[in-house]
Amino acid sequence: MCLKSQEMRKLAPELDPLRIGTGWKKEDLGKVQVMVESTYGDSHPGSGHLNILVEEVRKGIAEEGGFGARYFCTDICDGESQGTDGINYSLASREMIANMI
């Protein structure tokens, strides 16, 4: 089976040392790599719990023989922007977040 994550390693082998530098183990490099995105952040209670869920997802990926790498995008909160000019950007920010995925 052709694994996209392994094909990408062939195209850009210089990324392996960078990943090891961020805490990956050498044996993780040969596994199926799954990116797990989260909006986890400490700025408001709506996203403060998401890191726990990300770790559960990563655990499931590892149990199936893969490696789950986490990455984060912004966690805009409508509740904090209400009553300010920031609320005008709420819908636009959701589109930007969707485009990051």
Name the predicted role of every residue range.
Residues M1-I101:
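Metallocofactor- and cofactor-centric catalytic cores in central/energy metabolism, strongly enriched
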